[in-house]
């Protein structure tokens, strides 16, 4: 994530980075790593270095939160990039079909706002459910997490070309 942030900063593009986790519907925790208005520097690097995995993946809520922030930005192309390790899930019956359909609805809502949602996952089973959520060209499965530092900047360049 740190290397990707460095690469994003080098492009000169405005960007924000957030992490999220959940334990039931309330609250979905959103951790600001870098806001759009914040300059990339030591404080941001420290937040990125300190992030740890936690709890569950209530993807629909995270996408809606990101969509609200991103839709307020004046940029012509607005990429909503989701980096995840698995499919939508949470404790309160957000498993299976409900989590999948809520996430799919959040993706459709993002597109209606003029955003470009795209998912990057390290979940080897991602091809089983991500086409339904993001469409055939709206995601990529990176099976080896060690490839993320190399692949994310290249993917960003392709998505924003």
Predicted regions and their residues:
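Acidic, glycine-rich A-domain
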Residues: 2-161
């Amino acid at each position: 994530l740190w290397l990707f942030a460095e690469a994003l900063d080098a492009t000169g593009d405005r960007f924000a980075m957030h992490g999220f986790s959940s334990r039931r519907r309330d609250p979905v925790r959103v951790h600001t790593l870098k806001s759009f208005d914040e300059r990339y520097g030591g404080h941001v690097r420290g937040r990125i270095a300190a992030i740890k995995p936690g709890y569950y993946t209530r993807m629909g809520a995270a996408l809606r939160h990101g969509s609200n922030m991103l839709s307020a930005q004046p940029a012509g192309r607005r990429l909503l990039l989701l980096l995840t390790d698995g499919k939508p899930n949470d404790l309160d019956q957000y498993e299976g079909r409900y989590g999948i359909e809520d996430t799919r609805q959040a993706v459709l809502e993002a597109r209606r706002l003029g955003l470009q949602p795209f998912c990057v996952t390290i979940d080897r089973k991602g091809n089983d459910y991500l086409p339904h959520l993001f469409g055939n060209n709206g995601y990529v499965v990176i099976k080896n997490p060690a490839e993320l530092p190399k692949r994310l900047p290249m993917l960003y360049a392709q998505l924003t070309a």
